[in-house]
């Protein structure tokens, strides 16, 4: 198979030494007793990393305890991290396959090459090109620190339920870039000189809330401050915006060299741009990224994979597995800023994207226009409402390849119904960052026998190949790219 982005061969692009490795760890496809190698646990003498269940007397500093929660694998070498992740993903797939086979009465997979008792072909994990400081987006909370200061900016330890919540500064975490930590530190400086209290619990009052920092590979930095207006007048509210603006333009915060500063007033835990518009206090309204030969526009509210270099590996993998051609319609569900579909647009007859966040759809349309892509269209709204009508409008007999990249909550069951029941979809690529819960249910309903009671009338899909892609070094998380056909 000739790759869309590479020379002919099966997923060959990661066969190189990750940073700091003395020799190549992963080859092409699993051969031999690979599981025995990757299933090796921590080396002798190394303590296993368990997530702290409380914040009572524990060994280690606050910083170490936060690292154990946010980046549980930080004490392992990156090579060992990949072994742990691969073993975990394989166990998930083994359980999933067993359940699907039980539902079908017989094995539902075809005679593809085996990979250590899996019916599907499990490829080796693709390592992240960047191991430390890889996050391009970080959200910092505001609450009481270990010293009791309520104007501490960082990440949480403990739980509200147990009454032991504490906010710990995060500049030591391996996955956070220095720039993000710098902006968080200066936001803390600003809070501690502000006469207004932070909003720790909504009903107890307070104003200043979390900080989000977004950066691109060129070093441009967007900061977004969330603020609870409480009972402030419009004039008082305007004064606070001017004060924080002055701090980051001409005050101590100027050291952050922000490209843009946004302000969002919010009386809810999480507000979209539609619910409460982001207000640009100064700078550029967007940041831009270069990925897969595309210039991509990113709005404050738009989803973009948090590891840019890893995202390129992920999207290349998706593109390779789709097998699209000039007669294919590519259906990109939960498309975000449209990168997957747009990167494949030159190889397909048409790209159809669906995304809930309006800002992300506007970014996708801008990216298409800027890059001269004319065979794409993007729709705003819930996929379960848009997809059935969109599929009905397409010509019979035209092949459709679907790519789904849902949030951790998975796909709505009506989306699964639409995919199952539209016979022109023969190939489906499913990207999952957390294959359990709703995502597991999605896979089962894609592969189970026809079930009129659930309105699953079309032929079942068959899981053919799985490629793990590590976008989250130092954490247990890993993206899985699953190829289904029927």
Swiss-Prot record:
Entry-linked InterPro entries: SAM-dependent_MTases_sf, TRM2_met, TRM2B_chor, U5_MeTrfase_fam
Q: Does the keyword Cell membrane apply?
A: no
For biological process, the GO terms are: tRNA processing
Q: Which UniProt keywords apply?
A: Methyltransferase, Mitochondrion, rRNA processing, S-adenosyl-L-methionine, Transferase, Transit peptide, tRNA processing
> Which terms does the record give in the GO molecular function aspect?
RNA binding; rRNA (uridine-C5-)-methyltransferase activity; tRNA (uracil(54)-C5)-methyltransferase activity, S-adenosyl methionine-dependent
Q: Which CDD domains match?
A: AdoMet_MTases
Under Gene3D superfamilies, the record lists: 2.40.50.1070, Vaccinia Virus protein VP39
> Does the UniProt entry include the keyword Protease?
no
| Domain of life per record | Eukaryota
Q: Name one GO cellular component term.
A: mitochondrial matrix
**What are the binding positions for S-adenosyl-L-methionine in this chain?**
305, 355, 405
Give the first-level EC class, as a single word.
transferase
> Can you state which reaction this protein catalyses?
uridine(54) in tRNA + S-adenosyl-L-methionine = 5-methyluridine(54) in tRNA + S-adenosyl-L-homocysteine + H(+); a uridine in 12S rRNA + S-adenosyl-L-methionine = a 5-methyluridine in 12S rRNA + S-adenosyl-L-homocysteine + H(+)
The EC code for this enzyme is 2.1.1.35, 2.1.1.-
Localization, per the record, is: Mitochondrion matrix
Q: What does this protein do?
A: Mitochondrial S-adenosyl-L-methionine-dependent methyltransferase that catalyzes the formation of 5-methyl-uridine in tRNAs and 12S rRNA. Catalyzes the methylation of uridine at position 54 (m5U54) in all tRNAs. Specifically methylates the uridine in position 429 of 12S rRNA (m5U429). Does not affect RNA stability or mitochondrial translation.
Question: Per the similarity annotation, which family is this?
Answer: Belongs to the class I-like SAM-binding methyltransferase superfamily. RNA M5U methyltransferase family.
Task: Kindly provide the name given to this protein in its UniProt entry.
Answer: tRNA (uracil-5-)-methyltransferase homolog B
Q: Which organism is it from?
A: Pongo abelii (Sumatran orangutan)
Q: Taxonomic lineage of this organism?
A: Eukaryota, Metazoa, Chordata, Craniata, Vertebrata
């Amino acid at each position: 198979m000739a790759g869309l982005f590479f020379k002919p061969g099966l997923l060959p692009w990661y066969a190189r030494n990750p940073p700091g490795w003395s020799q190549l760890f992963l080859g092409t496809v699993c051969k031999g007793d690979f599981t025995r190698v990757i299933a090796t646990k921590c080396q002798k003498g190394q303590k296993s990393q368990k997530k702290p269940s409380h914040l009572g007397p524990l060994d280690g500093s606050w910083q170490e305890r936060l690292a154990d929660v946010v980046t549980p694998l930080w004490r392992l070498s990156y090579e060992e991290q990949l072994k742990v992740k691969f073993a975990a993903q394989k166990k998930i797939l083994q359980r999933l396959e067993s359940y699907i086979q039980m539902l079908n009465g017989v094995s539902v997979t075809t005679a593809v090459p085996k990979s250590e008792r899996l019916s599907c072909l499990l490829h080796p994990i693709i390592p992240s090109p960047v191991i430390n400081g890889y996050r391009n987006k970080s959200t910092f909370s505001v609450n009481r620190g270990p010293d009791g200061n309520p104007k501490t900016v960082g990440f949480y330890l403990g739980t509200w339920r147990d009454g032991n919540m504490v906010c710990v500064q995060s500049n030591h975490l391996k996955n956070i870039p220095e720039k993000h930590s710098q902006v968080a530190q200066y936001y803390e400086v600003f809070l501690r000189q502000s006469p207004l209290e932070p909003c720790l619990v909504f009903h107890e009052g307070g104003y200043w809330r979390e900080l989000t920092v977004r950066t691109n590979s060129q070093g441009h930095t967007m900061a977004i401050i969330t603020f609870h207006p409480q009972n402030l007048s419009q004039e008082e509210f305007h004064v606070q915006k001017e004060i924080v603006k002055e701090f980051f333009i001409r005050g101590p915060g100027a050291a952050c060299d922000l490209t843009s500063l946004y302000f969002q007033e919010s009386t809810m835990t999480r507000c979209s741009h539609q619910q409460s518009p982001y207000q640009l206090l100064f700078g550029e309204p967007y940041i831009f990224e270069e990925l897969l030969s595309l210039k991509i526009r990113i709005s404050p509210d738009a989803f973009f994979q948090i590891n840019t270099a890893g995202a390129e590996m992920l999207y290349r993998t998706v593109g390779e597995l789709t097998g699209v051609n000039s007669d294919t319609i590519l259906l990109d569900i939960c498309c975000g800023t449209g990168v997957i579909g747009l990167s494949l647009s030159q190889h397909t007859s048409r790209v159809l994207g669906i995304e809930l966040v309006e800002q992300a759809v506007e970014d996708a349309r801008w990216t298409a226009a800027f890059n001269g892509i004319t065979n794409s269209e993007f729709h705003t709204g819930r996929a379960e409402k848009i997809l059935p009508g969109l599929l009905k409008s397409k010509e019979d007999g035209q092949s459709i390849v679907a790519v789904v990249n849902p949030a951790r909550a998975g796909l709505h069951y009506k989306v699964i119904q639409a995919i199952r029941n539209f016979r022109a979809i023969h190939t489906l690529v499913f990207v999952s960052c957390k294959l359990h819960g709703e995502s597991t249910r999605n896979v089962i309903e894609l592969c189970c026998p026809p079930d009129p009671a659930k309105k699953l009338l079309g032929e079942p899909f068959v899981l053919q190949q799985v490629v793990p892609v590590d976008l989250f070094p130092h954490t247990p998380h890993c993206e899985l790219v699953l190829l289904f056909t029927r």
